[in-house]
Amino acid sequence: AVGMLVSVIATYFVKVKNEKESPQIALNRGVYSAAIGFALLSLVLIKYVIGDMTFVSGGIEVGSWGLWLAILVGIGAGAAIGHYTEMKCSAKYQDVQDLAKSATDGPASLFTKMLALGMATAFVPALILAAATIAAYQFGGLYGIPIAAVGMLGTLNMQLAIDAYGPISDNAGGIAEMAGLGENVREKTDKLDAVGNTTAAIGKGFAIGSAALTAVIMLVNYAGKMQMDVSLLSPWACAGLLVGASVTFKFSALAIDSVGTAGAQMKDFIVKQFEDDGPVKDAFEALNKAKAEKRDPTPEELVIIEAGKRAADYKGAIAIST
């Protein structure tokens, strides 16, 4: 209920101050406003309901301040995952720019880079969730972990509203194009569409992160109900499960990215030999001339082609691939 209230109030902070300001900044302002409001009202609510009462959860004595700090952990984890997702999906950051640049090398290079980037992004959110699990346990015991999930989901209404921004802006761009509106209108809708794609990715990252934290809660609760004397009750074990599962994706991403990087370097190295003045370029031009005229190379052209083959730097290409 508190989350719904602050999300409604936060919508009034989503305003673009001028044409130069990115719509993403305005949307982020709404999210952060909702998070701050939720944190403050949660403290008031916890103090009113819990007061000075304390209880023991998971061997840790928990009070109202501990529960509030657990909520702050959840809010911080959600904000961190959202910001990291924006860094990996927004066109103003280096990763997306490098991905677009790799498209100039061909679809294979683009796909390799894209797959590596997508797999690598699983690692940092897992670290954030692992840290949030441990911190929430230190502040609120086992009960602090679900409370942290509540903190992460406290601004869910605002996140879902921003997630809906993507298809709305996309449809606006389609209508503008079909209506034959001016180029300036289409430029604005394209800008909004780009931000919409980012907000959609942020919403998915936020949802997946909160679902992962909820899964940790269910695992701990199951172990407790079944009275299982195993380390699953330890938040360190749960954090280790999250990090360990993501390490596979991280190392796979590094391996795939190395293949793409080596391929791009190989392409640049070979193209440079054909573009620089010398025997290789002369041989390439002689061969293309014969193909264009649909004939076999003349004896003079064969001499030039053989000279180009001998002058080619094969060792440099082998060094790149090995």
What are these regions (language model features)?
Residues 1-322:
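Hydrophobic packing and interface segments
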